[in-house]
Amino acid sequence: MSGRVLLGGRDSVPLRGTWAVLHRVTRQSAGPIDSVRTDTAGRYRMQLQRPRAAADSGAVYVVSTWHDSLAYFSLPLNVQGRTAVRVEDLVVYRTTKGTPPIELARRLVTLGLPGADGTREVLEILELQNTGLSTRITDDTLVPTWSGAIPPSAIQFQAGQGDISGEAIKRVGDRVFVLGAIPPGQPKQLTYGYTLPAGGGRFAIPIDQATRDLNLLVEDTVAAVEAPGVESLGVQPVEDRRFAAYRAGPLAPGDRVTIGLPRGPFRPQMLVPYVVGLLGAGMLGALVWALRRKPLASGPATP
């Protein structure tokens, strides 16, 4: 298999002399199996041995490289039945702290009907865009690479999995902190959920930063949604339920977005058929994963 390692910037250039490492991942084990340094053109070539056992035939292979304190990985490689495998270019970046700015490109908020105890589950999926030419990092848990506001009344916060690992997401007061690296390129998704206590009459979504697009999925089709330039996308029947979809944006810090809180049970899995058309494949994978997560355990509220 062969590929290139490039140093990203205004013009990507070959990265000479860096290690390209081939990894094999099976159900039983995972680890590097070969490595080579790139040449003057940033190219590398490695020989992949044919599987020695039936268990190895289901192995997944990836190529990684390391630059400026960060590891970069290729997508999983399809090697079955192929004599040559071309790996996508691995583009690495220098790292910086505090810059470049991270934009909130898209925010999806899903609000369900109250459960038997009156609480309501909220799921959010966000897309963050690094607008610069370097990967933003942090080494201080009090200085996140990005942060955003959530309702002060939210309890039982739980980070999900996306492009940004749930382990790199935490709640600090009324904010969500991202501590993971955010490289340039395609927007990176993060997912989290929380519970709204019973008794609230309206759900206010805090807008603390510029947001290009805001999508809302509300299970109550007659809920009063208020937002600057809000657009109704209609009501979609899904089995025995109906969901109202809305779009707003671009939004400025301080813009007011509120939703009247309905009543009734919420089965989030029913959202999936509609979301296919509304969001497309990009956000759908994250939404499906998040909605299939185990329900939040009942217990004391977390700050």
Task: Identify the residue ranges that each predicted region occupies.
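Lumenal/extracellular ectodomains and adaptor appendage modules
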Residues: 1-303
